[in-house]
Amino acid sequence: MLYPTPIAKLIDSFSKLPGIGIKTATRLAFYTIGMSDDDVNEFAKNLLAAKRELSYCSVCGNLTDEDPCAICQDQSRDQSTILIVEDSRDVSAMENIQEYHGLYHVLHGLISPMNGVGPDDINLKSLITRLMDSEVTEVIVATNATADGEATSMYISRVLKPAGIKVTRLARGLAVGSDIEYADEVTLIRAIENRTEL
């Protein structure tokens, strides 16, 4: 159907979001148009504020509005363990289960030889630098159970083991090909409790 240009542009904008197809984008566009001016202004203000005010923690790479992030500043956390994840959504998933109390490191991607993504293309150098000046004794690799997640975990293991750092992987309660952010709390708790050494 042919929509007026402002609606068509709004539909196009919504459809660029992950997991949003044309039908959902159309519903969101029409819902937004039906909102009060105050609600639309608040939505736009919050969207712009999130984009402007958030950045990546200089220590762990997590999305934050302060630097270093609240997790890195929290001295009550276990300073001897770092859990490595693909992105900030995985940090949120792990924090929601309230079972892990160590630190994090966010890679912002995975090694993917098929897509031309190597170790230098993700946030690994800062991890190695961070580990040199720390009391970390264990690194838990919590990448997704995919080919790229496995390639990344094996690379991390090969790099860190010679330095005497214990490298473990989440237990396989997680289905192969699944994303950590979508796993239920019980599965994540068991995956941490039953992690295996690489």
From Swiss-Prot:
Domain Toprim, residue spans: 80-175
Gene3D superfamilies noted in UniProt: 3.30.60.80, 3.40.1360.10, 6.10.250.240, RecR Domain 1 (1.10.8.420)
Keyword Zinc-finger: yes
Domain of life: Bacteria
Keywords, alphabetical: DNA damage, DNA recombination, DNA repair, Metal-binding, Zinc, Zinc-finger
GO molecular function, one term: zinc ion binding
GO BP: DNA recombination; DNA repair
InterPro entries registered for this protein in UniProt: DNA_Rcmb_RecR, Rcmb_RecR, Rcmb_RecR_Znf, TOPRIM_dom, TOPRIM_RecR
Residue intervals of every C4-type zinc finger in the record: 57-72
Pfam families: RecR_C, RecR_HhH, RecR_ZnF, Toprim_4
HAMAP family membership: RecR
Family: Belongs to the RecR family.
Function summary: May play a role in DNA repair. It seems to be involved in an RecBC-independent recombinational process of DNA repair. It may act with RecF and RecO.
Name of this protein: Recombination protein RecR
Organism of provenance: Streptococcus sanguinis (strain SK36)
